[in-house]
């Protein structure tokens, strides 16, 4: 484990003074009493601040709404899970038997939460300036690529605005299935749009994420027309 953590620390670009903090950040609540949820809470707040400050300086002419949408894009689950895969965090996670069996080391929500927990752990092990430097390095490519615009809006918002612009009825969303235990549920939602006369399905770790997935499928169809 020590050798593995040394490798991980090289990958994330930070050497812990208190390795126990890193170990805790990698521990899912299904595996132990001392898990990473409190670190995740802290890391989420710090990440939002770091990204908000970076965007504030990078886009001096953008308004609050544009900055908020760009920040949401950069701190959302898929972006964090992508970082986790770059660091191969799935190889280091401590999971309970149930999560191991269900492939929790690949689940985006668990990977994203772990990235936030590591940020929280780094902040406790060092200081805000050091944490900011590390996180900005992780986000170097994303911060260079991101631009304000409609593409920063989430799929549900974009779909609603598209339909409103054409004076069409808004979509309806219904949960059709919930699988798994309370701490690792998967929601399946159907979305119906009257003028298309088709039902689209989406799945996710929450109802909101499932609705977003379904809306994204409809948008892909509309953009092909």
Swiss-Prot record:
MF terms (GO), sorted A to Z: double-stranded RNA binding; metal ion binding; ribonuclease III activity; rRNA binding
Enzyme class: hydrolase
Entry's localization field: Cytoplasm
Domain RNase III: start-end pairs: 5-127
Assembly and interaction partners: Homodimer.
Functional summary from the UniProt entry: Digests double-stranded RNA. Involved in the processing of primary rRNA transcript to yield the immediate precursors to the large and small rRNAs (23S and 16S). Also processes some mRNAs, and tRNAs when they are encoded in the rRNA operon.
PROSITE patterns from the UniProt entry: DS_RBD, RNASE_3_1, RNASE_3_2
GO biological process, any: tRNA processing
Record's protein name: Ribonuclease 3
UniProt KW Lipid metabolism keyword: no
Catalytic residues (UniProt): 44, 116
Coiled coil: none
Residues where Mg(2+) binds: 40, 113, 116
The species this protein was found in: Pasteurella multocida (strain Pm70)
UniProt KW keywords: Cytoplasm, Endonuclease, Hydrolase, Magnesium, Metal-binding, mRNA processing, Nuclease, RNA-binding, rRNA processing, rRNA-binding, tRNA processing
E.C. number(s) listed in UniProt: 3.1.26.3
């Amino acid at each position: 484990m020590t050798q593995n953590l040394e490798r991980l620390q090289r990958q994330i670009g930070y050497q812990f003074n208190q390795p126990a903090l890193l170990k805790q950040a990698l521990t899912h609540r299904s595996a132990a009493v001392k898990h990473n949820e409190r670190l995740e809470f802290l890391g989420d707040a710090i990440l939002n601040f770091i990204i908000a400050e970076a965007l504030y300086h990078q886009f001096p002419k953008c308004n609050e709404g544009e900055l908020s949408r760009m920040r949401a894009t950069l701190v959302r689950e898929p972006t964090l899970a992508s970082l986790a895969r770059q660091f191969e965090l799935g190889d280091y996670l401590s999971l309970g038997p149930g999560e191991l069996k269900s492939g929790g080391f690949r689940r985006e929500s668990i990977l994203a939460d772990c990235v936030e927990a590591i940020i929280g752990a780094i902040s406790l092990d060092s200081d805000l300036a050091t944490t900011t430097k590390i996180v900005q390095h992780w986000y170097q490519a994303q911060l260079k690529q991101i631009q304000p615009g409609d593409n920063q809006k989430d799929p549900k918002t974009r779909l609603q605005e598209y339909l409103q612009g054409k004076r069409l009825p808004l979509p309806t969303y219904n949960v059709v299935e919930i699988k798994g235990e309370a701490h690792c549920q998967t929601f399946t939602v159907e979305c119906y749009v009257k003028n298309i006369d088709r039902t689209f399905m989406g799945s996710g770790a929450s109802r909101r994420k499932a609705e977003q997935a379904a809306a994204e499928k409809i948008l892909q169809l509309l953009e092909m027309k």
